Regions:
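Short, structured loop/turn "capping" segments at alpha-beta junctions
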Residues: 139, 174, 192-196, 224
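A short, N-terminal "cap"/entry segment at the start of jelly-roll beta-barrel domains
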Residues: 1-43, 48, 56-57, 141-144, ...
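Amphipathic alpha-helical segments enriched in hydrophobic/aromatic residues interleaved with Lys/Arg
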Residues: 15-20, 26, 127-183, 187, ...
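Short alpha-helical segment immediately N-terminal to, or the first helix within
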Residues: 216-220, 267-271
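Basic/polar phosphate-binding segments, predominantly the helix-turn-helix DNA-binding elements
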Residues: 183, 187-193, 202, 206, ...
């Protein structure tokens, strides 16, 4: 098997053994710095490690713009209304904040699911995109779905390795981590997912306008949704905004808004152990009845039963 890409000092083709050597080293470092199942940030700004075991319990979260490299195992995510399965050797790029339900489908104690995730600094990537010529100058301006999965380029994998190695040389992080992070952005921009990233980081593009609307919704989900006003915020006609919003997120603005609220309410009940009425009020619902109805519609059961089941499942997986 041959992977496209250029290693520093290497040729234009890299064989499987070269890819495996880099990936194996990354797995060692990931397991060293995340010794138990879980997910968390590292001392490198924006870099997180995820180590998980296979389970049937769906977890809900808000995926934020990032570049994720899968090192081992497989994961299934339902993002919007679409299902994605991805694993070792693949790169997941999130272009816009999206609510997701996910679980690991392949991960054991000896070979857990391992993933590295690098947050995308929108301003830095947008500035870099202006300096890097597009790979397809005549590319369409149509909106893209906000999620992309492709084979990871070995040059990106190698840059992630050099970034991870800094965890063992913390004194070098302040100087070298920003440089390697910028290199990862650059290599992604010139790679197979470059056009995808560029669409969400080009001022005035329809995808970036939708990303701006999504950011506003994320920051203001407790407030009532006025779609016409939100469309005006990003300089779009309401009908155009509706169409492009669904193209990017696979959800309507109203569905997206509800999902943000309900995911946060579920998180509050699970992690802060507040009751359903308080959780609904905290995320913007004025009517407990409406909150319970919409919660059951999304999660398939009333809040109390859902939270009890999730807590029992979490206890059983420990």
């Amino acid at each position: 098997m041959v992977f496209s890409g250029i290693l520093p000092g290497g040729g234009s083709e890299v064989r499987m053994e070269d890819w495996k050597r880099i990936n194996d080293r990354l797995k060692e470092l990931a397991m060293k710095h995340m010794p138990e199942p879980g997910a968390g940030k590292t001392d490198i700004p924006g870099l997180s490690i995820s180590r998980r075991l296979a389970n049937d319990v769906l977890e809900n979260s808000l995926y934020t713009p990032c570049i994720g490299v899968m090192l081992q195992g497989r994961k299934k995510s339902v993002i919007g209304t679409e299902e994605y399965v991805y694993g070792e050797g693949q790169c997941l790029v999130i272009g816009v904040d999206v609510p997701s339900s996910f679980h690991v489908v392949d991960g054991t104690k000896d070979a857990p699911f391992l993933c590295l995730s690098l947050d995308v600094d929108r301003f830095q990537l947008a500035r870099l995109a202006l300096e890097v010529p597009p790979s397809s100058p005549g590319a369409s301006e149509e909106c893209l779905r906000g999620v992309s999965v492709d084979t990871v380029d070995i040059s990106v994998l190698d840059a992630f390795l050099r970034l991870m190695e800094l965890l063992d040389r913390p004194e070098q992080i302040p100087v070298l981590a920003p440089m390697i992070t910028k290199e990862i952005y650059y290599r992604m921009l010139i790679g197979p997912q470059g056009e995808f990233l560029r669409r969400f980081h080009t001022l005035g593009s329809q995808s970036m306008q939708i990303a701006q609307a999504v950011t506003w919704l994320r920051d203001n989900y407790r407030s009532p949704l006025q779609v016409e006003e939100l469309a005006r915020r990003v300089n779009m006609a309401t009908s155009t905004f509706h169409r492009h919003f669904k193209e990017v997120t696979s959800l309507s603005p109203l569905q997206f808004h509800k999902r943000l609220r309900l995911f946060e309410a579920q998180r509050l009940m699970l992690s802060e152990r507040i009751d359903a009425a308080s959780a609904g009020l905290a995320v913007g619902y004025e009517s407990p009845t409406q909150f319970n109805r919409e919660y059951k519609r999304l999660f398939g059961e009333p809040p109390h039963r859902n939270i009890t089941r999730l807590r029992n499942a979490q206890s059983g997986s420990r």
